[in-house]
Amino acid sequence: MHVKKYLLKGLHRLQKGPGYTYKELLVWYCDNTNTHGPKRIICEGPKKKAMWFVLTLLFTSLVCWQWGLFIKTYLNWEVSVSLSIGFKTMDFPAVTICNASPFQYSKVQHLLKDLDELMEAVLGRILGPELSQVNDTRALNLSIWHHTPLVFINEQNPHHPVVLDLFEDNFNGSASNSPAPGRPCSAHRCKVAMRLCSHNGTTCTFRNFSSATQAVTEWYTLQATNIFAQVPNQELVAMGYPAERLILACLFGAEPCNYRNFTPIFHPDYGNCYIFNWGMTEKALPSANPGTEFGLKLILDMGQEDYVPFLTSTAGARLMLHEQRSYPFIKEEGIYAMAGMETSIGVLVDKLQRKGEPYSQCTKNGSDVPIQNLYSNYNTTYSIQACIRSCFQEHMIRECGCGHYLYPLPHKRKYCNNQEFPDWAHCYSALRISLAQRETCIYACKESCNDTQYKMTISMAVWPSEASEDWIFHVLSQERDQSSNITLSRKGIVKLNIYFQEFNYRTIEESAANNIVWLLSNLGGQFGFWMGGSVLCLIEFGEIIIDFVWITIIKLVALAKSVRQKRAQARYEGPPPTVAELVEAHTNFGFQPDLATPGPDVEAYPHEQNPPIPGTPPPNYDSLRLQPLDVIESDSEGDAI
Amino acid sequence: MAPGEKIKAKIKKNLPVTGPQAPNIKELMQWYCLNTNTHGCRRIVVSRGRLRRLLWILFTLTAVALIFWQCALLISSFYTVSVSIKVHFQKLDFPAVTICNINPYKYSAVRHLLADLEQETRAALKTLYGFSEITSRKRREAQSWSSVRKGTDPKFLNLAPLMAFEKGDTGKARDFFTGRKRKVNARIIHKASDVMHIHNSKEVVGFQLCSNDTSDCAVYTFSSGVNAIQEWYKLHYMNIMAQVSQEKKINMSYSADELLVTCFFDGVSCDARNFTLFHHPMYGNCYTFNNRQNETILSTSMGGSEFGLQVILYINEEEYNPFLVSSTGAKVIIHRQDEYPFVEDVGTEIETAMATSIGMHLTESFKLSDPYSQCTEDWSDVQITNIYNATYSLQICLHSCFQAKMVENCGCAQYSQPLPRGADYCNYQQHPNWMYCYYQLHQAFVREELGCQSVCKEACSFKEWTLTTSLAQWPSEVSEKWLLSILTWDQSQQIKKKLNKTDLAKLLIFYKDLNQRSIMENPANSIEQLLSNIGGQLGLWMSCSVVCVIEIIEVFFIDSLSIIARHQWHKAKGWWARRRAPACPEAPRAPQGRDNPSLDIDDDLPTFTSALSLPPAPGSQVPGTPPPRYNTLRLERAFSSQLTDTQTTFPH
């Protein structure tokens, strides 16, 4: 009951608006509002009134339009960037070092023996007897060969290309213009291609090459991949270059370091790689000064004479700078360091920090990417390179049933090899050039929000100099092999200096271009500019609208009431008596109202009026005013109940 | 009545013309100050005391001044830009890659053209430095240059004699060819000494260039004979080559099959057909990969060296021109497809017997053109004709400008740049003194006297590939043997000899990752932002708005002007009336106030009666009853509609 009472009271309060008609309300609003235009509408002459009315409308619509623009701009989630450049103490980048050759030839020779003999025979067949030194009388293991053979394609007659197996002298195609056996073809007549077959040789494709060099290199790499995929990981690591053989000297700042400061990681392309300052187990090392003296100095031995001859033709060290706890994609982003040279690398850390959703489509840690990160086995952070490679491996497993040797394996899967998956090479080469696969991966993977690049300034000089060569090699050989003879050579030795430049960071940081403060101040500015308004004006306007609604309700109720009353009671017909009439009726007895009109008025309140007493003070006319309202009030109460 | 007039009359009736309410300026001002929406003015009128009023006037004026100042700042900084840097990971278009051999033409092919020049160069070397036999390590096949034309007149040394100047005595010079000392009456221009002050401690070497009549000569000296002889040789070389036709030159240079031994892009084999020929005057035949042949631009969707371009180049050092080029290798330019490769200006040199791996990062930049900065989208707003078949760049514009000036001043075009329409390359036969003219012009160009630097604007958008170059030994020791033999087999059609590793260079060009950075300039301000900033300023200082501005215009211009006009009109009318009728009868004074003794009108608030301005009660008063105290009847507005009724009933 109490609640109802308060509700009613509140309703009554609300009803007491600034007027009882629309016009009054509007006039009151225009007169009292703080916005600048409306006031002028009511206090001017008719011409200016019209002008001000139009102006006010115009300004209102302008404000609305501009507000719309601002809100739209705000919802675009634009960013502004701030750039800072300077020097500060920073964590030294993680440095990954690999040898260009993945394995020591002396240790993998037993695995590659058959393949190498075959390769030499292939070269012999291509080059012809006078150019090749090998005599192909040895028994060759042709099982590898028959799986994916290299063929000559004689395209002299473009409509009937002649396909000729390198080791067969009979022809698969038409027998026209056959070259002499033993010297099958020369370069300008034939192209070397690789035959890739699937499904037990039912469908075959030829992978064409414009030069024989590419053909034999690709063929060898494919075969070697097949062989290494079957070897367990521990053996592969043992066949690679051990850290103590690779890293001869290490100096970080003034502190000496050695191969134990490097974390080993096995890379399928480059064998054993070693990462300095990876920050996986201990804290990352900072560098507080620019310049060579405060950076990392390394002397490496590549051992070029022990390279796998057909697998890698480029000699040197491969190195890469990357962030702590990130996987080194050294094949993509690494650089070479040349043997017999001192390579100095000045580093500038180029960092880009982005805001995530809704400003840009980047991911903080890769958790919202629909692809399983296969590199998470290494405990590394998310990167888009990792995502794309994981995506490729996923496709590979789906299409070919086995994982590619170059990428990590998901749980319970196997690397591809010829024995278990005979048509994998065919499947892989189709997938590799498939653009659809790449585009799906690019689409599925998101960039990470923090992107760090290491800008390098590379310079080189000959090292060691001729004068110092002798003693340096003596010392290094003594240290590594405890031998008094020189076991190193200029062809394998690499010196590296990695250091921060004078300006070591450049950070580009995103921040929201349009924040809520910006939006409000611009909205306020626009409203103020056109109309001199503020939030309070908006509240005023809202109040007026509430009043408006109330007046409408009141009017509607009154209308309904009057219609009902008209039907029920005839005496409520007609307008209520005017004050003047009532005044006359109560005060002046000598004065008789006009008999023609007042009929209903006189009869209107017969039971309420006492018989006129002379000298009575005039009634409190103010109370009379409430008469029509009383009716309504009771009605609205009825409505409320 | 005409309908037009009818409407006019109607408008007049409905919207009567009324002037400003205030009768004079002072009242108008007062009215304005009291009623305006701006905050300061009201305080001026309302506050009491002279000091306060003065203070408020001061404050208001300061606020107005501040508004003007701030708004001026806002407007003047309207055309500023904000820079945004965005990174996209996406499939990237591979750039066009132009590969040139550093040596332009096979020496064996051009030798017949350059025989005279070579002989004279050797002769000059002999006279000054005292050695004659230059034996190339590589070139042993032809030493037949020696004494074939001993008796012929040296034409090149006569045209531009090489000389050595002794220290401190620039007037005397020793002629290279004759060895005689002779007097030189010419301006001595020390090449490079304009920018670097070199103290010539030893003999300097230079050559003399004369205009048509030999009186006006200039001598260009160099600190080292190497530079002097190379420069001198190059001048004559250009002279000779300018007279050779383009087809002949293309034939003398390297073919694509010769230069490119193998090619591999994105895991797929490619060959010479994927390269387009581009003939450069100073570098001979260059080949451009991915130059929008077949209207498709190759793109990369994986980063890393195996998905980029891998080529092995054949660089035959035996065919090198000993005087023109002194380094061995190839030049690589990475550029946009529609861009002209400036081989001589930019480019990375690659070495033989090495694998050069070039990792790229793509950065795109967009600038806003006029009125934000002085950059240009295309040729439309640069008054230079494009002589290159490529899109706009600053370099193209500068070169075009120089070439145009060259044609204008010297009458012929410089050899290392394309030919403008209707001009010829410079050579001795037609333009005997072009070298002098060229040097003069070039010096003026370097000193920015030609106006090219001010005419040419930078381009608004450009792509930039940041390169990370690293070298490795290639082929490795153990793979050298088989690799070279199979490469020899591959090239057996073009080259008949066995390849050496110093004849080959491997080049890898690839995207390190597919991150593309775009640096974009955006307008920092928009119109709406400017307006809202101005609005903020107006609101902050004075709570003013456009409405106030309109008010000010209305009050200070229209109303006050009309008041003044009316005032003047009245004055003029009064003056006219006084002149016409100096004695005008005074109009009877209008009755003031109501003659109702019983009714006292309150000053402060209007009563019912006063509000109605009732006429005085009629003389016949009703006796007995006092008039009602109408004050009590002061009605509120709600009753105003009923007043007419009261009025009608009252007189009874």
Swiss-Prot record, chain A:
InterPro entries: ENaC, ENaC_chordates, ENaC_CS. GO terms for biological process: sodium ion transmembrane transport. The keyword NADP does not apply. Component of the heterotrimeric epithelial sodium channel (ENaC) composed of an alpha/SCNN1A, a beta/SCNN1B and a gamma/SCNN1G subunit. An additional delta/SCNN1D subunit can replace the alpha/SCNN1A subunit to form an alternative channel with specific properties. Interacts with WWP1 (via WW domains). Interacts with WWP2 (via WW domains); inhibits the channel. Interacts with the full-length immature form of PCSK9 (pro-PCSK9). Interacts (N-glycosylated) with BPIFA1; the interaction is direct and inhibits the proteolytic processing of SCNN1A and SCNN1G and the activation of ENaC. The gene is SCNN1B. Residues 1-50, 555-641 are cytoplasmic. It comes from the Eukaryota. Glycans are attached at N141, N379. Ubiquitinated. Can be ubiquitinated at multiple sites and undergo monoubiquitination and polyubiquitination. Ubiquitination by NEDD4 or NEDD4L inhibits the ENaC channel through endocytosis, intracellular retention and degradation of its individual subunits. However, some studies could not confirm the ubiquitination of this subunit of the ENaC. Phosphorylated on serine and threonine residues. Aldosterone and insulin increase the basal level of phosphorylation. It is a multi-pass membrane protein. This is Epithelial sodium channel subunit beta. Belongs to the amiloride-sensitive sodium channel (TC 1.A.6) family. SCNN1B subfamily. It is found in: Apical cell membrane; Cytoplasmic vesicle membrane. Residues 72-533 are extracellular. Pfam families: ASC. Residues 597-624 are annotated as: Disordered. A motif (PY motif) lies at residues 617-621. The chain crosses the membrane at residues 51-71, 534-554. Disulfide bonds join C98-C273, C185-C190, C197-C204, C250-C257, C362-C449, C387-C445, C391-C441, C400-C427, C402-C416. Originally identified and characterized by its inhibition by the diuretic drug amiloride. The keyword Amino-acid biosynthesis does not apply. It catalyses: Na(+)(in) = Na(+)(out). This is one of the three pore-forming subunits of the heterotrimeric epithelial sodium channel (ENaC), a critical regulator of sodium balance and fluid homeostasis. ENaC operates in epithelial tissues, where it mediates the electrodiffusion of sodium ions from extracellular fluid through the apical membrane of cells, with water following osmotically. It plays a key role in maintaining sodium homeostasis through electrogenic sodium reabsorption in the kidneys. Additionally, ENaC is essential for airway surface liquid homeostasis, which is crucial for proper mucus clearance.
Curated annotation (Swiss-Prot), chain B:
GO terms for biological process: sodium ion transmembrane transport. It catalyses: Na(+)(in) = Na(+)(out). One of its GO terms (cellular component) is plasma membrane. InterPro entries: ENaC, ENaC_chordates, ENaC_CS. Residues 137-224 are annotated as: Gating release of inhibition by proteolysis (GRIP). It is a multi-pass membrane protein. The record marks R140, E141, K183, V184 as: Cleavage. Originally identified and characterized by its inhibition by the diuretic drug amiloride. Component of the heterotrimeric epithelial sodium channel (ENaC) composed of an alpha/SCNN1A, a beta/SCNN1B and a gamma/SCNN1G subunit. An additional delta/SCNN1D subunit can replace the alpha/SCNN1A subunit to form an alternative channel with specific properties. Interacts with WWP1 (via WW domains). Interacts with WWP2 (via WW domains); inhibits the channel. Interacts with the full-length immature form of PCSK9 (pro-PCSK9); inhibits ENaC by promoting its proteasomal degradation. This is Epithelial sodium channel subunit gamma. It comes from Bos taurus. The gene is SCNN1G.
